[in-house]
């Protein structure tokens, strides 16, 4: 983008409806140096931190946890839903974003959604990471990775794939393709391959709830 538009200043930001879009900002030279980051917190409006599942703040750099935001722009709460409000706020006004990420030298990096992290045999697996590797295959048009309960390992990693028209791909071929791209425990154990478009919700995202029920 910068090469094509010499006078442009590429930028990206991060925020949620619940934070009135306030969160982080990455623009100009910072963006060119850290293109994978959604930026730094916007002072003095926002503070951003990382917590574990027990609301303990993680001070170590590059440690993955849930992104939390504190800001005067944060919502007061969900309309007539006190229980849902309590689930996402602590007593100090920090809001749980539902996004997994880490902070490196002040720059925030988003890894995945909390609900899209699959725990398989004690290992955390990012669905986005696996989907990205699968999309590298030239036959794949759509791919949705998700977990389903499994007694021995906790969750099984599954993927539903829609192939491009006239293209073919077997489970064995996909597994072989992924061996050089992913650790073995990140390769899905359940693979559904077809030519039908994957179901989506109103926002356009894949309906992983519906896929789990198939």
Regions found by a protein language model. Give the residues of each.
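Conserved beta-loop-beta connector loops within the AMP-binding
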Residues: 4, 49-68, 87, 105, ...
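Conserved ATP/PPi-binding loop(s) of AMP-dependent carboxylate-activating enzymes
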Residues: 24, 40-45, 56-88, 125
């Amino acid at each position: 983008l910068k090469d094509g538009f010499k006078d442009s200043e590429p930028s990206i930001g991060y925020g949620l409806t619940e934070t009135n879009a306030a969160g982080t900002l990455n623009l100009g030279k910072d963006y060119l140096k850290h293109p994978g980051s959604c930026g730094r917190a916007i002072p003095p409006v926002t503070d951003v931190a990382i917590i574990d599942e027990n609301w303990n703040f993680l001070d170590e750099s590059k440690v993955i946890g849930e992104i939390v935001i504190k800001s005067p722009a944060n919502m007061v709460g969900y309309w007539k839903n006190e229980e849902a409000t309590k689930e996402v706020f602590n007593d100090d006004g920090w809001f749980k974003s539902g996004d997994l990420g880490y902070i490196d030298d002040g720059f925030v990096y988003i890894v995945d959604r909390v609900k899209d992290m699959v725990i398989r045999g004690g290992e955390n697996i990012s669905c986005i990471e696996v989907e990205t590797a699968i999309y590298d295959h030239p036959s794949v048009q759509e791919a949705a990775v998700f977990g389903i309960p499994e007694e021995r390992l906790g969750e099984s990693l599954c993927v539903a794939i829609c192939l491009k028209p006239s293209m073919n791909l077997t489970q064995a071929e996909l597994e072989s393709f992924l061996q050089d791209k992913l650790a073995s425990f990140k390769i899905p154990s359940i693979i559904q391959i077809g030519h039908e478009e994957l179901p989506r919700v109103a926002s356009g995202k894949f309906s992983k709830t519906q896929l789990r029920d198939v």
